[in-house]
C-alpha cells in the first residue's frame, strides 16, 4: 500500500435494516484526493444477496442512515459545502431527500420515534453572535471568551461551553414542521432514545453540582414534547448509549467508572422511573463495551430476552447477545476481526466487519448462517499488495504475557523494522486493516505492534497496571515484544526504528530517553511533559491526577522531557497546530531541548489540524504525513544507513 492508496479505501458504516430484515442501507465513505475532501453515499442491498449493492444517494457526504420503524422512510445526515451535517429524510422507494431542520453547527445524532412520525436529534445551540449566527461578525471579531470552568473545549470540536448540544424533536412527515427543543439549560445533552410508547426520551447529561470537576454523567428522562427532566441514575459513573426495554420499564446503558484510567465499560440497567439503583450485568474481567472501540454509532439493541452489543477481546471486537437475566452471552459474530457497527431486525443480524486485509464489508447472519454481501475492499486489493498480520506473544521480565503482531513485506529479509506503539494508553491495536502499518510494510519495513500493559481488551488489571507508573511496566512490555519479534530472522535487529502517536508518542520519547537501541524515532502528537500537559490539554486537568498522580516529583519522573538530556537518537516530531488533546507546546519543548543539545531533530507541523490528523485530517495532509514518515525511515533505516 502506498500513501495515495488512501483514495482506494472504502469504509462502510452504520448499517440499518427494514423491520422485515429484507433490505439494508449502509453509508460508504471514501477519500477524494483531487478535491482534497471526504465523500460518502448511501447504498442499498437486499440481505438475501439476490442483487448487488446499488448506490442510493449522491450527496457530497451522506452518513448515518436509519430506516423508520415501519420501513417506509430513510433518515440520514447530509453535509453540504459548509461541512455541517443536516438531518434529511427520503422515501425508501426513492425520490428526493427533504431537509427536516437546519442548524448553524449541524446535527450530531438522531433517533426515530416508535410510530415513525417524529425524529429526536442532537444539535449544538451557539451563543448569539458566535459561530456565524451574526453574519456581520467574523470569528476573529467575536467578543472575548470568559472561561470559568475546567471543561470548556474539546479537541476536534473546539470551544464547547458556548455551544451546548441540546435534544430536539421534529415531525418527520410534515413539510414545514418546526423543531421543538426538548432540553434547556447550560448543560450538554446527547444520545436520545425513545420510550416504546413514544411519550418520553432518555438522554445523557451531567447536571450535578460538581459536573465541572469530574467525568460523571447520568441518564435522564423527559417528555418528548418538552418539560422537566428526571434523573434516573444517580451514580458515580460516566454513562452512554441508553436504550429502553420493550415494555418501557427498564433502561439499559453502558458506563465506566469516572476516573477513566484503564477502566472497562460495563453493561448496566436501571428502572426507567428512577425508583431503583442501577445494576451491573457484565464483568470487567471479561468484557469491555466501550462504544469508542467501534467506528460508528454502536447502539444497544434491547429485546425481551437480551441486549446485543460489542465487546473487546484481545484485539478483536465481537458482537454478543447478553441475556437480561445474566446468563452466558451468545456470540453472533466473532473471530479474529472487528465488528464496527450493527443492526438487528426480522431475524437478521447485519454488521460492518473488518479484518487485517479489509477496511470493512457488510456481513449478515440469518438462521445462524453468515454471509458477506459486499466487496468494497476489492478496489484497494487491486491496487495494493496487503500483508497479513502474524500473531505474536512475548514474556515481559516479570513474567507477564504481551500480545501483539508482526507484519512483514513480501520477499525475503532481513527487513528494517519499525516498532509502533498505539495511543491511549487505554486503547488497542487489533484485528483490522491498519492503513499506517500497510503503508510501512509496502515500503519494505517490517512492523511490530502490540498491546502492552495499560491497553484495553485484556481485563481491568491489565488496563490499570500502569496507573501512577508510566514508563515502567509498559516500556518493559513494548521492548519484550520487540525482542520476541526480532527472533524472526526476517527482521533486521540492527536497523530498528520506533514510532507512535499520543500515548504512543509518549512511549517513543520515553524509550529513546532510556535506551540507544533505535536508529531513529518518530514521535507524533505526543505527551512529553505532564506538568504543562495538565494545564494545556483539554483533558489534562483530570487525566494527570487520575493516571499519573498528584505528587509533583512523581509526575515529572513519568515525563519523557525529564530525560531529554539522555536522548541521542535522531527524532522526527510530528504535531498539529490545532491539537488541543496533546497541545503543540508538548512538541515544542522537546524540540528546543534537543536542538540546544545538537541532537538531530526535525519538527513537522500541520496547520489547521487537531489530534485526529492520521484518521480524519485533510486528505492531502495525511498523504504528506505518510511521505514525511517514509522519507525519515529511508534516511535512517536504509540498507546503507
Locate each region found by the language model.
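Hydrophobic beta-strand positions that form the internal "hydrophobic ladder"
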Residues: 24, 71-74, 119-120, 201-202, ...
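Residue-level detector of Asp-centered blade-edge/turn motifs that repeat once per structural unit
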Residues: 19-20, 69-70, 114-115, 196-197, ...
Amino acid at each position: 500500500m502506498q500513501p495515495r492508496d488512501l483514495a482506494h479505501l472504502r469504509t462502510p458504516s452504520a448499517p440499518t435494516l427494514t423491520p422485515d430484515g429484507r433490505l439494508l442501507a449502509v453509508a460508504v465513505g471514501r477519500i477524494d484526493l483531487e478535491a482534497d475532501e471526504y465523500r460518502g453515499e448511501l447504498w442499498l442491498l437486499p440481505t438475501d444477496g439476490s442483487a448487488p449493492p446499488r448506490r442510493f444517494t449522491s450527496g457530497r457526504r451522506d452518513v448515518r442512515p436509519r430506516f423508520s420503524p415501519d420501513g417506509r422512510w430513510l433518515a440520514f445526515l447530509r453535509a453540504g459545502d459548509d461541512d455541517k451535517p443536516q438531518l434529511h429524510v427520503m422515501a425508501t422507494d426513492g425520490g428526493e431527500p427533504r431537509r427536516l431542520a437546519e442548524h448553524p453547527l449541524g446535527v450530531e445524532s438522531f433517533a426515530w420515534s416508535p410510530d415513525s412520525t417524529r425524529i429526536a436529534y442532537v444539535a449544538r445551540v451557539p451563543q448569539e453572535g458566535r459561530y456565524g449566527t451574526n453574519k456581520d461578525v467574523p470569528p476573529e471579531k467575536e467578543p472575548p471568551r470568559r472561561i470559568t470552568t475546567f471543561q470548556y473545549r474539546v479537541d476536534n470540536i473546539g470551544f464547547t461551553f458556548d455551544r451546548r448540544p441540546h435534544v430536539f424533536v421534529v415531525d418527520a412527515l410534515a413539510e414545514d414542521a418546526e423543531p421543538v427543543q426538548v432540553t434547556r439549560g447550560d448543560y450538554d445533552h446527547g444520545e436520545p432514545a425513545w420510550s416504546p410508547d413514544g411519550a418520553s426520551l432518555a438522554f445523557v447529561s451531567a447536571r450535578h453540582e460538581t459536573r465541572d470537576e469530574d467525568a460523571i454523567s447520568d441518564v435522564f428522562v423527559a417528555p418528548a414534547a418538552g418539560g422537566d427532566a428526571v434523573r434516573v441514575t444517580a451514580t458515580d459513573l460516566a454513562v452512554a448509549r441508553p436504550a429502553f426495554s420493550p415494555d418501557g420499564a427498564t433502561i439499559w446503558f453502558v458506563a465506566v467508572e469516572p476516573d477513566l484510567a484503564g477502566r472497562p465499560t460495563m453493561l448496566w440497567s436501571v428502572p426507567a422511573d428512577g425508583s431503583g439503583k442501577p445494576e451491573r450485568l457484565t464483568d470487567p474481567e471479561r468484557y469491555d463495551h466501550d462504544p469508542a472501540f467501534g467506528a460508528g454509532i454502536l447502539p444497544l439493541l434491547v429485546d425481551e430476552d437480551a441486549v446485543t452489543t460489542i465487546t473487546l477481546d484481545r484485539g478483536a471486537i465481537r458482537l454478543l447477545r447478553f441475556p437480561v437475566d445474566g446468563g452466558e452471552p451468545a456470540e453472533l459474530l466473532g473471530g479474529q476481526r472487528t465488528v464496527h457497527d450493527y443492526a438487528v431486525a426480522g431475524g437478521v443480524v447485519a454488521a460492518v466487519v473488518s479484518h487485517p486485509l479489509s477496511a470493512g464489508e457488510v456481513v449478515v447472519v440469518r438462521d445462524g448462517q453468515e454471509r458477506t454481501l459486499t466487496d468494497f475492499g476489492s478496489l484497494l486489493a487491486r491496487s495494493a499488495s496487503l500483508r497479513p498480520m502474524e500473531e505474536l506473544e512475548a514474556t515481559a521480565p516479570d513474567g507477564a504475557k504481551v500480545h501483539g503482531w508482526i507484519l512483514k513485506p513480501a520477499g525475503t529479509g532481513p527487513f528494517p523494522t519499525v516498532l509502533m506503539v498505539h495511543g491511549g494508553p487505554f486503547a488497542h491495536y487489533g484485528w483490522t486493516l491498519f492503513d499506517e502499518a500497510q503503508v510501512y510494510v509496502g515500503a519494505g519495513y517490517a512492523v511490530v505492534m502490540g498491546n502492552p500493559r495499560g491497553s484495553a481488551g485484556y481485563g481491568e488489571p491489565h488496563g490499570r497496571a500502569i496507573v501512577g507508573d508510566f514508563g515502567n511496566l509498559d516500556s518493559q512490555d513494548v521492548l519484550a515484544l520487540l525482542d520476541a519479534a526480532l527472533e524472526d530472522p526476517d527482521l533486521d535487529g540492527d536497523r530498528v526504528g520506533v514510532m507512535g502517536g499520543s500515548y504512543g508518542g509518549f512511549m517513543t520519547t520515553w524509550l529513546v530517553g532510556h535506551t540507544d537501541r533505535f536508529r531513529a524515532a518518530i514521535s507524533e502528537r505526543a505527551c512529553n511533559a505532564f506538568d504543562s500537559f495538565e494545564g494545556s490539554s483539554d483533558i489534562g486537568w483530570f487525566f494527570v491526577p487520575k493516571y499519573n498522580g498528584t505528587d509533583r516529583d512523581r509526575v515529572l519522573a513519568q515525563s519523557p522531557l525529564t530525560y531529554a538530556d539522555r536522548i541521542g537518537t535522531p527524532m522526527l516530531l510530528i504535531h498539529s497546530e490545532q491539537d488541543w488533546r496533546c497541545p503543540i507546546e508538548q512538541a515544542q519543548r522537546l524540540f528546543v531541548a534537543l536542538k540546544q543539545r545538537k541532537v538531530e531533530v526535525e519538527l513537522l507541523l500541520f496547520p489547521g489540524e487537531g489530534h485526529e490528523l492520521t484518521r480524519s485530517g485533510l486528505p492531502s495532509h495525511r498523504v504528506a504525513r505518510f511521505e514525511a514518515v517514509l522519507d525519515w525511515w529511508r534516511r535512517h533505516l536504509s540498507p546503507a544507513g
